[in-house]
Amino acid sequence: MPVFALIDEPVFPSPHLAEPGGLLAVGGDLSVARLLAAYRRGIFPWYDDESPILWWSPDPRPILVPGHVRVSKRLERTIRSGKFTVTLDTDFAGVIRGCAAVPRDADNGTWIVPDMIEGYERLHAAGHAHSVEAWQNGELVGGAYGVAIGKAFFGESMFHRATDASKVAFVTLCRFLDRHEFRFIDCQQATGHLLRFGAVQVRRNEFLRRLEAAREEEGMVGKWVLPRTTRCASPQPTSESSPSAKQ
């Protein structure tokens, strides 16, 4: 299959035309319009600072139904202990930079390059990209971010600086998405971590079928907020050390 060079307009070729490894197109930009057009078709950017923007549509594709997330007894005890305060859309910039700081290969490189950070921050400002944060003693110690299109959520990356912080954040996000009837989380890559949480591999045709239905449902554009009763927390941090005071 050919790899398509994108034009100035925010349009994409059919994801069915991707190479066997999932690569579909090259070029373009990370404008809000182009990112939304990509995610609506199940396409996402993934590249490093030595390559142009690369756009992917893998086959198969790992997805997780939020209501089917598997949580071990030990992790459930940690969630209930109040060890972490969990919030949504409180420090998107901190989360995406925390994810970017995590080494992804033997060369300590990252695929979350500065242009990508800026692109997703614009998408967040437009109300389409969201973060979940785990706090401990007023410090950001873990989290994840992704993109919501209708009732589909596309998980991008997560990080942790304290044991179980990203896991608690992720489970809390899953339960929030389930409560709001999201159909699935696109995990993009099948890692052992996500498979243990209950992610399953589906073929591209099945993924796109699910996405076509989910994207037409009424979504949740704008800032997301967790009900206080689901924040997995002991008393909230004081105003001097609260997440909101850190921005």
Swiss-Prot record:
One of its GO terms (cellular component) is cytoplasm. The keyword Acyltransferase applies. Keywords: Acyltransferase, Cytoplasm, Transferase. It catalyses: N-terminal L-lysyl-[protein] + L-leucyl-tRNA(Leu) = N-terminal L-leucyl-L-lysyl-[protein] + tRNA(Leu) + H(+); N-terminal L-arginyl-[protein] + L-leucyl-tRNA(Leu) = N-terminal L-leucyl-L-arginyl-[protein] + tRNA(Leu) + H(+); L-phenylalanyl-tRNA(Phe) + an N-terminal L-alpha-aminoacyl-[protein] = an N-terminal L-phenylalanyl-L-alpha-aminoacyl-[protein] + tRNA(Phe). GO terms for biological process: protein catabolic process. SUPFAM superfamilies: Acyl-CoA N-acyltransferases (Nat). Transmembrane segments: none annotated. Its EC number is 2.3.2.6. It comes from the Bacteria. GO terms for molecular function: leucyl-tRNA--protein transferase activity. It is found in: Cytoplasm. Coiled coil: none annotated. Functions in the N-end rule pathway of protein degradation where it conjugates Leu, Phe and, less efficiently, Met from aminoacyl-tRNAs to the N-termini of proteins containing an N-terminal arginine or lysine. This is Leucyl/phenylalanyl-tRNA--protein transferase.
